[in-house]
């Protein structure tokens, strides 16, 4: 299930990495609305299975390049971020006490919490790059100067409802 979305997610990461000029150990923030992937209004159609499928595909693609990731939760958790503890410590980010759920944090960040080795939530980061799937507004978690990149893969196999 969701094979097309996984393939598309890997293509997004590959195209992004070709343009973004990141190095091993850099941090990327990912915001992802499963509602938007499924052609619904953001926040209205959270899908845990879709979030998990897309997260695992993207996590694997970034891991191959040794790029660290953080996932942005939704506004119910004040857009907190889920990140590996080792990365939070390496970058000096302060941990906050929240745990994402599909309808409070988002399905994508819930999957991150489930599949990261030692996940923690942090309030803010300054990532070197970011991918925003579904207009989740990740800009607050990027460095002050960020250059947008345009990729060919614009959608993750949008279903029609």
Report the location of each language-model feature.
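Low-complexity, flexible helical/coil segments
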Residues: 62-69, 105-110, 161
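Non-transmembrane, aqueous-exposed alpha-helical and coiled segments at domain scale
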Residues: 10, 24-27, 35-45, 57-99
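General beta-strand structural signal in soluble alpha/beta enzymes
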Residues: 30, 69-73, 121-125
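A glycine-rich helix N-cap at a beta->alpha junction
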Residues: 91-118
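A generic local secondary-structure boundary/capping motif
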Residues: 19, 59, 100, 146-153
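Generic, ordered loop/turn and secondary-structure boundary motif
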Residues: 23, 38, 43-46, 132, ...
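N-terminal glycine-/serine-/threonine-rich phosphate-binding loop
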Residues: 1-28, 48-61
């Amino acid at each position: 299930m969701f094979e097309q979305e996984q393939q598309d997610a890997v293509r997004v990461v590959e195209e992004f990495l070709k343009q973004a000029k990141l190095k091993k150990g850099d941090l990327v923030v990912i915001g992802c609305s499963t509602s938007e992937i499924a052609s619904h209004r953001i926040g209205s159609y959270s899908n845990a299975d879709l979030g998990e499928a897309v997260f695992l595909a993207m996590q694997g693609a970034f891991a191959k390049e040794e790029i660290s990731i953080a996932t942005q939760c939704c506004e119910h958790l004040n857009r907190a971020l889920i990140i590996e503890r080792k990365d939070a410590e390496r970058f000096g980010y302060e941990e906050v006490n929240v745990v994402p759920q599909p309808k409070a944090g988002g399905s994508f960040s819930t999957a991150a919490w489930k599949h990261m080795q030692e996940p923690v939530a942090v309030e803010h980061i300054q990532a070197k790059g970011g991918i925003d799937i579904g207009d989740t507004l990740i800009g607050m978690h990027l460095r002050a100067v960020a250059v947008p990149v345009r990729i060919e893969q614009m959608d993750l196999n949008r279903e029609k409802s």
